[in-house]
Design a protein with these regions (language model features):
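Terminal accessory/targeting
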Residues: 1-46, 58, 62-72, 183-240
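Active-site beta->alpha N-cap acidic-glycine motif
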Residues: 30-121, 125, 133
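Catalytic domains of cell-wall/extracellular-matrix polysaccharide-remodeling enzymes
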Residues: 59, 105-214, 219-234
Length: 240
């Protein structure tokens, strides 16, 4: 009886050890909460423009959820109606949401009134869905000038890695361009309206996880790098 009990206890000890090792090998499970200790690992932020589009954005959210990865979505205002459930899902699953203008307009070419219709109108729509107004701004085409900076009333986020996924709809090429250029602190630009971009994004996540990278939202990336985001200031990335 004693030997059997020892063997049984030994079996369960090995089983629990195996489970523990397996758990540590899994992809990241959560985004660090504000105030938590800084992460000692290379960090990047995945960002997606021009959504939401129901088919592709939903697939992307599924893939990110499976991997425990947060991203930042810069939405087009006129595409919000009918996709409110996706936006709520983004919020619930730990993603960050930003403004990409109501109609994807060059903000540098607009009067103050037209700027408000493009940016403040979308901010109001998001407020009605999420109950808050603190959204980052990414101007379409990366178009920024002094007037945009003055009118933004929020931090302006561009990017530091652009695989031009809109130009060549090829998941292999998009993945390659990102992996050849990405570094700790980068903000990666993609578009969640293309199936090839969704595929490339998830490949990039899997490959960079294997290399020890972790993924965070734009605001969390800035915090981890010791940068306080300021209204009207332009940020392209957070490399050291």
């Amino acid at each position: 009886m004693g030997r059997f009990w020892l063997r049984k206890r030994g079996f369960w000890a090995l089983f629990l050890l195996f489970c523990g090792l397996f758990a540590f090998s899994r992809p990241q499970a959560a985004v660090p909460a504000e105030g938590e200790a800084l992460i000692e690992a290379p960090l990047v932020a995945l960002t997606f423009d021009d959504g939401p589009r129901r088919s592709t954005t939903a697939d992307l959210l599924d893939g990110l959820q499976e991997r425990g990865v947060p991203a930042t979505f810069f939405l087009i205002g006129e595409q919000i109606e009918g996709t409110e459930d996706l936006i709520k899902r983004m919020e619930e699953e730990g993603h960050q949401i930003g403004i990409h203008s109501y109609e994807h307009r060059w903000l540098t070419a607009l009067s103050a009134a037209d700027f408000a219709r493009q940016v403040d109108r979308e901010r109001q729509l998001l407020y009605e869905i999420l109950g808050r107004e603190d959204f980052l701004l990414r101007p379409p085409y990366g178009g920024v000038d002094a007037a945009v900076e003055k009118r933004a009333n929020t931090p302006i986020v561009l990017w530091s890695v652009d695989p031009e996924d809109w130009k060549e709809l090829d998941a292999d090429r998009v993945t390659q361009r990102i992996l050849e250029n990405v570094e700790d602190g980068d903000v990666i630009l993609l578009h969640d309206i293309y199936p090839t971009s969704v595929e490339a994004a998830l490949r990039v996540v899997d490959t960079l996880h294997e290399k020890g990278f972790l993924f965070v939202t734009v605001s969390e990336l800035a915090r981890q790098k010791g940068i306080e985001l300021e209204n009207g200031k332009v940020y392209r990335g957070f490399r050291g």
